[in-house]
Amino acid sequence: MSKPSYKVADISLAEWGRKAIIIAENEMPGLMACRKKYGPSKPLKGARITGCLHMTVQTAVLIETLVELGAQVQWSSCNIFSTQDNAAAAIAATGVPVYAWKGETDEEYMWCIEQTLVFPDGQPLNMILDDGGDLTNLVHEKFPQYLKNIKGLSEETTTGVHNLYKMFKEGRLGVPAINVNDSVTKSKFDNLYGCRESLIDGIKRATDVMIAGKVCCVAGYGDVGKGCAQALKGFGGRVIVTEVDPINALQAAMEGYEVTTMEEASKEASIFVTTTGCRDIITSVHLQQMPDDAIVCNIGHFDIEIDVDWLNANAKEKVNVKPQVDRYTMQSGKHIILLAEGRLVNLGCAHGHPSFVMSNSFTNQVLAQIELWTKSDKYAVGVHVLPKILDEEVASLHLEKLGVKLTKLTEKQATYLGVSQTGPFKPDHYRY
């Protein structure tokens, strides 16, 4: 069955998208270094990479890097609200099949992913680049005939990695996978520093709210939660954290945050951010006892953290204030302001993480794709991480842009520490 060569909101936005991509390239030194280092040898030649990851300007730079390295690429977004339509148009205009636009329905979302499985020459995908696991699950559950040709997959985010480990434990994973999320240069940078900037961007664009002085509740204190708590505190918010893990709870307490339950926090906070990657974090009980016009949003991957279905079924009225901002009137007469329908607020209400930090993450993705494509015999079916030396290389590629001058170990110092002068400098279990 024939398919459209692309489907985006408006192809005439391509010129605008190209201007944004050019600016982003200058902020993404890791990806540009990959082009310079690997472009001539085309290590991804023959790879047919199907990607399902937020179709943003930064992702456009990733896609063009994969193409420069020899791959054929097809793309969809991993969230119905996260596409930047100018970026999607710019990539589609280059001939790369893109199926993504901001504001897809759930049915359109799955249709878009399905369009990327078979390439224009009739050949199916042989590599997966995923964010969240929807593409991975679709291939395993609905199109298992393609698994035999797939050399591997790389997964971007915490939620998708949880899915991979669960699949492997249950014997359902059919291909080797690289967990990009747990590269230090991804999780300790994208998850923390990226969210520290993009959360506030999303909340401010959506609501224009003054954060200073307000009580803010952050559900979860992993890397994402840490970044969100820092951001809200930095703007003068009085931050409460909720946690299930005693280690994370202790970390939050020793950073000076109040740590309590959502049952208690929901009575007091004016701004709520869920960051957990788990379901049922803010329930009907919590929503009903929030202060009037409480702002509720999520920065975890899926829309299962806030009980949006209950809100839609039980609120007296729902008013759409503007795209991705809804104000609910509760039975009590109080109001709840929900952002991005409970989906990723930083991408639904803003443009996601800045280019520089995404260069960290996406350089890991490129290296993971090269590893799996060129060294497939090295990787058995299972979930793997990139070697520490590559993690350090990713960090090194981003130092010059920030004016960082790295100290070099002397031979005597290296011998004393028992490491090479060129790394890796830390054991795999080091937590940073």
Swiss-Prot record:
Record text on cofactor binding: Binds 1 NAD(+) per subunit.
The record's listing under InterPro entries reads: Adenosylhomocyst_ase-like_sf, Adenosylhomocysteinase-like, Ado_hCys_hydrolase_NAD-bd, NAD(P)-bd_dom_sf, S-Ado-L-homoCys_hydrolase_CS
> What's the cofactor?
NAD(+)
Keywords in UniProt for this one?
Hydrolase, NAD, One-carbon metabolism
Gene3D superfamilies the record matches: Adenosylhomocysteinase-like, NAD(P)-binding Rossmann-like Domain
Q: What does this protein do?
A: Adenosylhomocysteine is a competitive inhibitor of S-adenosyl-L-methionine-dependent methyl transferase reactions; therefore adenosylhomocysteinase may play a key role in the control of methylations via regulation of the intracellular concentration of adenosylhomocysteine.
What name does the UniProt record give this protein? Adenosylhomocysteinase
Give me the gene this protein comes from: Ahcy
